[in-house]
Structures are given as structure tokens and as C-alpha cells.
């Protein structure tokens, strides 16, 4: 249990004990303490006096006074108590307890903030999963940044996390890709060939065709069906190699790359189909096979096998989720990050897992809303260089990996977001990622100066000299790090991390502007050096959750 939770729990226990000691109730109702919106109203506040009115048969103000009179302030770590309004009890803590976070951070270092108690829950997070038919764009970039950050947060909070990319390599879009590459191959070999109407016209397809013409001239002599099969596989291989490199450069990592074709090769689709039939959730109508998803809150049943006997795109997805739930000893939770165009897909997919006996609540789906790239107040839709949609690679080249990841994680995924590319490149306090990284670099500079004076961070410094209000506010932020991670994990909210980073950096800058770290007072200097080292560890670990670097020089 982290320091903040420990202090809060102790306060609750002491309030409960004082209620009993005052004879207000034999069975004490649950005591709730909240952080007041206005810091002037204390560190914590409780409404227990009003809750006890009917039980104690006294007015809440009298009850509050009785609780205060019987409270052991020393045990509760309370410095001052005020009764406000009809009977709210406001507690002002002795904030020296916060200094305990300094040696904890120094000792744990890279593990500071991580939950030491495992959740014993396996979570598989699937994100990006773009079709291997072209470059990644800004929507995929947001999905990558949010998915990777969410996975980092869940891991830090104690979940057993698996990160996965689903390769859609068995559908019609891959057939179109193969025909497109075949046409470009033939053109490169000197043959006049038209691209299919629904083909892919990107420059990368031209390059693949030219490359294959140079390296694999023998393909022109293969029978048509064999040739198309080769082009399918080579096309997917080329595109996936490019996507993997872009994602790796974007600090986005996966534990597994799951190919849709394996569902066919291993008979997973037929297995799941039989299971759903046995469970009574399929039926025949109009020459097609339907899945009875309306039994589980979908707005209509869904076709899974068409009249011609071919599968709809929905059936492999159903089989894929069955595989995910049952793989590696079984997953407790699946989290999917989908693009905004998949909103209508949520109910049918959640309904489908119910048909083979999985509680739909174990499948969580987050929708990534649209991102607009903005430059000089105008939306940028096309690349000036290529005339096509702006790619992830171009965004990384334009604003840098750190800025791209940070900006794309700053807002809740279910909200639309304008990405100001000019702001992302600014070296100013207005740029949130620069502001955060500058705090880290500034601490490095101070620690270097301290080291030159022979002063290094110490877990055994006398922290009682830390009394400055700005220093206490800074320590409060450090102490909130682990609870923030727990909250971000529980609510699947990566943007809470970037919000926290901004608050921590702001608290540090305010402290820095209000007091000096390096002075002639050796005891205070030692304490402050140790404190800002703890702040730096916290800032570095928080930035790492977002996949952003923590530079020592800027």
C-alpha cells in the first residue's frame, strides 16, 4: 500500500475509533473521506457526522465536535481540525509524512510507482491491427500511442499483460493487394497491364512490383493461381516489414503478431462455428447462416456464412476472439482499441462472445476518435511531399517521436483531438512535452552541480527541514504517482498519466522558482538534493509509461 493510501486508511480507522469512543454508534457506518476541491478546506474531509444523525439522534455539528474531541490526532497524523457548514469535518495533516516518499523513490528507482502486489489477472491488449495494404496514418499513430501506453500502465499496476497485433491477411483486401502487385510486377517486366478498379495505387505498390521484377523474374512463368498466391504472401511480407519498422521506431512494442490465416489453417473457424451451433445460436435463413446476436443486445442478427458458402468478415473475428480468450491458459480480460469507424461493431462482437459462453464484460472495446493534424491554424490533410495522406513516418520526421507520442496520448481516446504540429516543435513552456522534459533536464543540471560539491542524494538525509509550502506540494505530487497509475489502469485512461506529468513538472518549476536547492545550509541542501532526485525518478518513470524519453540535457 502506498503512502497516501496508508495515511488515508489510518485516518479512517481513527475516525471510526473516535465514533465508538464518543458513544455515537456501536455499529459504525462506513467512513468515507474525500479530498476537498478547495485546498483551503484541508487535506481530507468527511461527512460522517451527518451520516450518524439518525443513529445518534443529535445534530450533526454536535456529533462532529464529539468525534473531534475523541480523535487521537497524533495517530491520525492530523495537525489541525475544523468543523465546517452543517457538520463537515476537515482535516489538515502533518505533511511531514510525505517526506517518507523520498527514500522510497531513491531505493526503488525504476520500480518506483509499480504495484508490488500482482493482480493475478491476465489481460490481452490488441491495438493498431492495420491492414497490411499501405502506410500507417495519423489514426493508427494515435491507436499505437494509446495502446502501448495503456499496456505499460496495466503492467505497472500489476496485471499480466500481452500486447498483440492482428494481421488481416486473409480477406478480400489482400486479394486486391495481390492483384495490384501482380499488375505492377507485369508493368515492371514490360507488359502493358491495367490495375484492377478496386486495387491499391500507392507508390509502395509500384516499388514492390519493381523490386520483385528485379529479384524474382521467374514469377512471370508461374501458373496464374500459383503466381497470385505468391504475390499475396510477398505483398503481406513487404507491408508488414515496413509497418513493424515504423511501429518499432515509434517505441510501440508487441508480444505477438497474430495472422488471420492461422485461423483457417488450424481449423479454428470451423471449431467455433460448431460450438455456436451446439449452443443453439445459429440458424439458416434466406440461404445464409446467421448468428443470433439479438439474444445479447445486438440490434439485429448477423450473417456469418453467405449464400455462396463463403464466410463474412465477421466470422473470423468471432473465431479470433475465441482463440484470444482461450490461449495461454486463458485470458481474463481482452481490450481492443478500434478506430472510430468500428463503433457499430461493438455490440455484435460483444454479443458473439456470449454465444460461446464468455461474459461480454470481459471484452472491453475502446474507440479511438479522429485526429486532425493542424498547422498554422489550418487542417493538414495531405502530405506536401507525396500528395497522399500523411503517414506515421512523416509525423515522426516532422515533430519527433517523443512529441508525437505525448500529444497523441494527452486526450481521452473517445474525444476528437486537434494535433498542433507547430506547438509540438516549440522549445517553450507552451509545449507540454518540452515543459515536462525540461523539468527533468533542469534537475539533472542541479544534481550535477551538487555532485561537484560532493553532495549526492541520500535516503538518510534529515527531511524534517523540508517545510516550504511549494516543496510540500511537490512531495504530494510524488506521493500520488502510484495511486495515479492504479486509477489510470482501472479506468483504462492513459491520458491521466500525461495530466499527472504536467502537474508534477508544474509543481517542480514552482518549487524551483520559490526556493534554492543549493545553499550554504548543508542540511537543507542535502534534503533538497535528495528530494529533487526523487522527483526526477518519478518524472522519468512517468514519461517512460508514455514511451517518451527523459533527457539530461536540452
From Swiss-Prot:
EC number: 6.1.1.19
Cellular compartment(s): Cytoplasm
Pfam families linked to this entry: Arg_tRNA_synt_N (PF03485), DALR_1 (PF05746), tRNA-synt_1d (PF00750)
Keyword terms of this UniProt record: Aminoacyl-tRNA synthetase, ATP-binding, Cytoplasm, Ligase, Nucleotide-binding, Protein biosynthesis
GO biological process per UniProt: arginyl-tRNA aminoacylation
One of the record's GO molecular function terms: ATP binding
Motif ('HIGH' region): 130-140
GO annotation, cellular component aspect: cytoplasm
Record carries keyword ATP-binding: yes
PROSITE patterns noted in UniProt: AA_TRNA_LIGASE_I
Enzyme class, first EC level, given as a word: ligase
Residues spanning the signal sequence: none
Reactions catalysed, as given in the entry: tRNA(Arg) + L-arginine + ATP = L-arginyl-tRNA(Arg) + AMP + diphosphate
InterPro entries registered for this protein in UniProt: aa-tRNA-synth_I_CS, Arg-tRNA-ligase, Arg-tRNA-synth_N, Arg-tRNA-synth_N_sf, ArgRS_core, DALR_anticod-bd, Rossmann-like_a/b/a_fold, tRNAsynth_Ia_anticodon-bd
Family membership: Belongs to the class-I aminoacyl-tRNA synthetase family.
Annotated HAMAP family: Arg_tRNA_synth
Subunit structure comment from the entry: Monomer.
Protein known as: Arginine--tRNA ligase
Gene label: argS
